[in-house]
Amino acid sequence: MRKYLPLVVALLLALCTTALAQEAKPSPEPSPKPKPAMSKAQIQKALIATEKKLWEGWKNKDPKPFRTWVANDSVGITDHGTETKADLLKEIAAGGCEVKSYELSDFKLTMINSGAAILSYKGVADGTCGGQPVPPTWSSTTYVNRGGKWWAVAHQESPAK
């Protein structure tokens, strides 16, 4: 056993030297933590705020909220048929509606999946479009989360009775 002791010590020294001589690997940079998923209540609050910005834009004849929140591939469904985002922007710019005030109520959010939702609600406006009173509507807007931003991709209105 004694005759193997110097050999064992030499092997241990060689192993230790090899282990110490290895290049230290830098620790990986911590990757940014992804934003935590929003709760349904947080999504509803955000989408209601967006919907109100769109109604404010309509009331004030301001196309900016529509450029900001309505997707380029969106579709609108009204009593006149379907319209694109470009049609909607032309309609806002033409200013055919005079809206004094509006009220949105009875919100309901339906989650399709974590990146798509339908916000439905009742809209009542004090105003006219084309000289006719604006009727109360039941409306729904479908939103899709693209790159972390909720975009309106479809909107429809039906007269409320």
Regions flagged by a language model, labelled:
Residues Q22-T68, D73-K161:
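A beta-strand edge to alpha-helix "cap/lid" segment located at domain peripheries
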